[in-house]
């Protein structure tokens, strides 16, 4: 899912996304700070064909809503995690791989986090997913916050656009209280 609210650049305070017909509808709640472009890309799971909706709140309190239809064969939310079938996945839990790509007015961060993102819909496997993320500068100031929900794919891939040449780190927490950090 790629969301681009750059038409409202400088005014975006919050972006919400959900999949109407998914068993777990919420996808993310993104709050970009002034040093981030109002863009976000993230891989998600879809159970069946569904409308995807995004609501963008601007400083004036207005919500701007857009949508698209996603066609899917189905089963994405109720399929067991491929990650759990891989030997040693626990040792890689929370590892972040990523790269920074130069752009005209800053850079794009593209990250992948090792995590099964279990949504609790597979028998015998409880919810276990990343639910909080913050992009911070080297001083620890929050540049953006991101609340994630179990509709996000396992080993989630996230792309963010940062203004300027800010050195950053990613902080993550899952619903079991595990915390992870990566310098980017």
Name these PLM-found stretches.
Residues 74-98, 104:
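Low-complexity, Pro/Ser/Thr- and charge-rich linker/hinge segments at domain boundaries
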């Amino acid at each position: 899912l790629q969301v681009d609210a750059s038409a409202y650049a400088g005014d975006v305070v919050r972006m919400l996304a959900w999949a109407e017909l998914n068993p777990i509808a919420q996808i993310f709640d993104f709050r970009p700070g002034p040093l981030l472009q109002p863009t976000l890309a993230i891989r998600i799971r879809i159970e069946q064909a569904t409308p995807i909706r995004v609501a963008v709140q601007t400083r004036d309190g207005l919500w701007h809503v857009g949508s698209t239809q996603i066609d899917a064969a189905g089963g994405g939310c109720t399929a067991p995690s491929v990650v759990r079938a891989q030997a040693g996945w626990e040792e890689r839990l929370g590892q972040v791989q990523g790269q920074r790509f130069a752009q005209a007015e800053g850079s794009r961060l593209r990250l992948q986090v090792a995590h099964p993102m279990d949504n609790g819909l597979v028998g015998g496997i409880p919810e276990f997913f990343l639910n909080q993320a913050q992009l911070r500068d080297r001083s620890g100031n929050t540049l953006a916050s991101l609340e994630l929900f179990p509709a996000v794919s396992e080993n989630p891939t996230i792309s963010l656009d940062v203004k300027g040449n800010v050195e950053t780190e990613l902080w993550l927490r899952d619903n079991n209280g595990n915390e992870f950090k990566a310098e980017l």
